[in-house]
Amino acid sequence: MTLHRPMLIALLIALVPAMAAAQKTSYDFDKAATFSTYKSYAFKDGTPAGQPLIDQRIVAALESELKAKGLTKNDSNPDVFVLYHVAMDKQKDISSYSTGPMYGGYGYGWGGGWGATTTDVRVRDILVGTLAVDVVDAKKKQIAWRGLGTKEIDTTAKPEKRDKNIAGAVTKIMKNYPPKVKS
């Protein structure tokens, strides 16, 4: 199957914004932590988003993920404390694409040959959010695991989309909890 140049350009134009909006995640952990003994959790104060509805969505998504991983909520005597931190940052998004040289075909006279290239550049202001989730050993009072997720925020999203975005972000961040410890 051969892609024609206009179709290839259209495909690239469609994919670039999708790749730019992808969430980046990472995690780190204390290799001495005994994750298999962590059975219960309680939330501690972190750095909330400052928007109660967003904070409620984050807590609900974390509760769902922790429950799926076998942890139960225990506010009086938890094995770990879970904290989350939210940061927002305005950034510039600069993207460009070039059409590349165009071939005009064969022929005599002034009509044939290669054409000029054009490059389009787009600069826009974006809001990037970072969500950090800390799992702190309640007895040692030390961070056992930290997950981070960074993504462009869609400020025009409807509530249902925000629910989905936050739940998806938390799921992706918590994917590597507990970490697979190599012996």
PLM feature spans:
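Bacterial N-terminal signal peptides that target proteins for export
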Residues: M1-I13
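"Short basic amphipathic alpha-helical interaction patches in structured regions
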Residues: I58, S96-G100, L148
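Surface-exposed short loop/turn segments
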Residues: K69, V80, Y84-Q142
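C-terminal/domain-edge helix-coil "capping" segments
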Residues: H4, A22-A33, V123-T130, D137-S183
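Short, low-complexity, polar/charged sequence segments that are solvent-exposed and flexible
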Residues: A60-S64, G100-G105, E152-D154, K164-G168
